[in-house]
Amino acid sequence: MIDYMKEYGKVSNEFALEGKVLEICPYGEGHINLTLLVTTDKKRYILQKMNTRVFPDSDGLMNNICGVTEHLKARGIETLSVVPTKDGKSYIKWEECYRVYDFIENTVTYQTASDINVFRNSGKAFGEFQNYLAEFDASKLTEIIKRFHDTPNRFAAFKEALEKDAFGRAKDCQKEIEFVLSHENTYGIAMEGLKDGSLPLRVTHNDTKLNNILMDDKTGEARAVIDLDTIMPGSMLFDFGDSIRFGASTAAEDEKDLSKVHFDINLFKAYAEGYCGAVKDSITAREAELLPYGSYLMTIECGMRFLTDYLSGDTYFATKYEGHNLVRCRTQIQLASEMEAQFKEMGEIIKEILA
């Protein structure tokens, strides 16, 4: 059994903590970084061993986090608070990289939306996060994962994997391949908009899951958006769309029975009410017009990535059985095609909310 005090006591003492460290123990559900709760005789902190294999640019990542959190704090918004090292750095690099945040007390996280109001509130939380950062110069941010939502680039990678067909799997997924190829003309709208300025460059979170919102344990209201490692420059369409992709589906991402997989327009409406209500003052007309498209784009992009990985021998996404990535791809294609069929209705919902 690991003695966390022995293992991490020394590194925790390199940070400007209040009080004497009494206890260090594992904390939370995160998979990327090792997260520990540090208790002193004065207060509590979160110590993280940063995963430099997933995110090698620790300087860029911490500059992004510090820039965004300082901007939010200057506006009186509750957010993650980076605790500096004793010599004033945002993180420490020994054999591994470590950082510390103040622990935000009296909060809880939810793994799943127990009801439609929780999903609406998550839309409000991520919308407020976007709105508060509308004036932040996103061009100052480091692109932590290069070309993360550059869908045409993802499509090029898909075509390359298809051409190679290194594992002879293309014959098993002709229908899915045909869907991805036939929608090529829909993939470039967001990137073209960012390039020509018709879509503003914004701060994007890029991991808008429900469990990345700290909720007040008494009122249930959102207190702070957390897990800021994937903060990058991008489009509002990316965060909104990805939330809808996984949040407005009636089934799990790897549901084999496609008769259970549907895009739920009522869940879309609930999230949009929360999100659009919060960004009313900063959203542009073009962004509002493209929110339904953003939902489709993030869904088809994700499906395309699953299909690319399947064709390439399952080297990126963790799989539990052969064909797992193909099953995931099929759910995303099903959702994307249902969204496509309901663009008009989705657009009317957005217009009504923003009217």
Where are these regions (language model features)?
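Active-site beta-strand-loop-beta-strand hairpin of nuclease catalytic cores
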Residues: 39-44, 220-221
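ATP-dependent phospho-/nucleotidyl transfer catalytic cores
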Residues: 25-29, 52-59, 107-122, 135-205, ...
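Hydrophobic alpha-helical bundle architecture
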Residues: 102, 274-295
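ATP-binding pocket architecture of kinase catalytic cores
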Residues: 43-140
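Juxta-kinase regulatory segment immediately upstream of eukaryotic protein kinase catalytic domains
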Residues: 1-25
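ATP-binding glycine-rich phosphate-binding loop
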Residues: 20-40
